[in-house]
Structures are given as C-alpha cells and as structure tokens.
Amino acid sequence: AALAYGPNPDDHAGEQFPNYVPRMLVSQFMRDKQQRESNLLWATDADTLQEQAQWCAKLCKEGQERYSEALDACQAQSLHLPESPRRLLRDSILLQIQIYYHCYRGAALTCQSLIEALDGVYQQAFYHAGLAREEYLAANAAMRSREHGKWSGFYANECLTDVKYTAWLLGHYMGYLR
C-alpha cells in the first residue's frame, strides 16, 4: 500500500510524507502564500504553492484510498483470529495501517483546505483544516490506545513523525484563517 511519490524504485512514502509535506505547505502559506515551498523542489517542479498543494492532495488521496482498503482487509482478518494473535495484529500491523490511513486522510484534507484558502474560500478552508486536525489526533489516539503492559507510555514521545505537532500546527493555521 506504500505510496510512490516519484519514478525511482525507492520513492515510496511512509508516515513522514503525509505529516512533513503538509506542515511545510501550511507553514509556507502562513509565511508567504505568494511563494512556493522551496523545500519541496526535490519532489515537484510545481510553480506555485497552489500547484504544490494540488500535487500533494493527489498523492495523499491515493494513499488514503490504499490504506482504507488495507484497513478494511486487516480488520476483517482480525475477526477470525483467537484473542492473543488478534491483539498482536492490532498492536502492530493494524496500528501501522491506522496511522497511515489517518495521516494520509489528514494530509488530503489539509491540502484541500490550502487550495480553498488560496482561492479565498476561507470558511471551507477552516472547516477542512479542522477535519484534517481531527485525523491527525485520531492517528495519535490510535497509537496511545495500543499502549499496554510493557508498552505503556511507548508513544508518549512520538517525535520522529510527530503527528501531535501536525495537529498543533493545523490548530494555529485555523487561527490564522479565522
């Protein structure tokens, strides 16, 4: 289900793509919406911030669809397992799919919000930013829900991808739009 963002065999995105790229785009919008995000020139030759948001939206919608299918399949399979293997599946593979699904959905909504804001449709942009924020919070909640036993507190310092930071930034972006 990994999303290909470029032509090379190793150009496949993990959970960082739907967090880092939308954060870069949102930050650029708040900094100077007339300029594209120069830190994305390695990935796209889009000339404007809006084109970059459209590029990201297209990829992230595809990622959302892929992980939605994987999520449905994995959840269906988990129902046929005894309790111990089911818990292991939910703590590992299913959790990772949930994180990816929520992050890609959040990223697609973030890009939709940016496109609307760049078009001057601020009420819709605000609404979609709020939905995006909720998706990133859902990804964090999924991680925290799988902490138990020796894994208690394991995701409290999830700081590599930092989905909580993505949600926090979207909260500030919503304030900016307001």
Pin down the residues of each PLM region.
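Substrate-binding groove of N-acetylhexosamine-processing glycoside hydrolases
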Residues: 1-178
